[in-house]
């Protein structure tokens, strides 16, 4: 009897492994991704099964919100000129079309944009706008802590809810796991609608833990929006133990807020299974500037990796400069190659990273990519006063990209992210000035400094690079 059970479990086990291998093959992934999974499943089946369950499943064909619902929400945006019409510079019209076709990200005209480079100024601006709210406040953060900063926000929202303002909050269930349940319950008791995005009951027993909502947006009365890299926690305002927290966030007034509204309402519909609509959520707004922007929300569910495709497309067509700020650099092969080719072609490619991030493992993996970058002529600068958490891309003298997405596998493949693509010469000049000011606080490394690193350090970097897609 025992022998029969042994054979039975062996057959079931083998069929399971073969079935997963067949699924991986028929997903038609990049062979560089397919082959390692097959090797791990064959050589270490138990470990392979566990890792595949958490990190390997391809959810691109699944949807958390139907196309019909998404279209119904985005159709509430005021339909502007087609991106091939006047306004967007001819060089960037294909990029605008790419974002339109992959994300239904329509060009939005005439927004006024304020830029914040520290958490204190961003928080003060946010609190001022909350105090002015009259109809609704929509808030979405990856991290919503119950520390002093989080409690300050909570108290302001509770006060507005008591005034009759409709307050809705989405937070990521994994990113905000440090906050006590009582923190959210107190807001619900005050009449605020609070939901966790992709709720995870048992983090150790679900593959959903690998797919998180990394967006950081606020929309107030459909007229004012915030987007960028800052969450709600004390460290974004006060800094870290080893220095300041340097980040970038936008306050958008005008039509750009409608793009943030559409993203929030899509996530709200996916989370609560309720659809919110009405002209009060997309009020008429004036045109304040000549800025043209596209709000680009991307995620793991769907055919396209739109932010990766858009960044790669823009980088490959740069003519003068490509300036990047990112806390983590764990790029895809396509993006990494595009940057090296640009540098080899004589384009000014400059990558700014934190001298120290919040993860030593990620630092090691990031550094493994820098040798080839420097050999190609890419300038590498390390920000020294604290943690550089800013996510910024400047292409030539026209395109600026800011938002929640890092230059890493997780942002491009697994997370729900949102970036703003701004087409404007004057605005690009403003962002370049910020980049240049940050450079005064950086150390730009030379090949003579970088290449003689100890062999043990290089081995550690290479080892961590193997795990880049999981970090």
Can you say where each PLM-predicted feature lies in the sequence?
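Short, solvent-exposed amphipathic alpha-helical segments in soluble enzyme
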Residues: 338-342, 368, 437
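A beta-strand-loop signature enriched in Asp, Gly, Thr, and Trp
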Residues: 345, 349-395
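Thr-Gly-centered strand-to-loop micro-motif
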Residues: 324-326, 383, 402-403
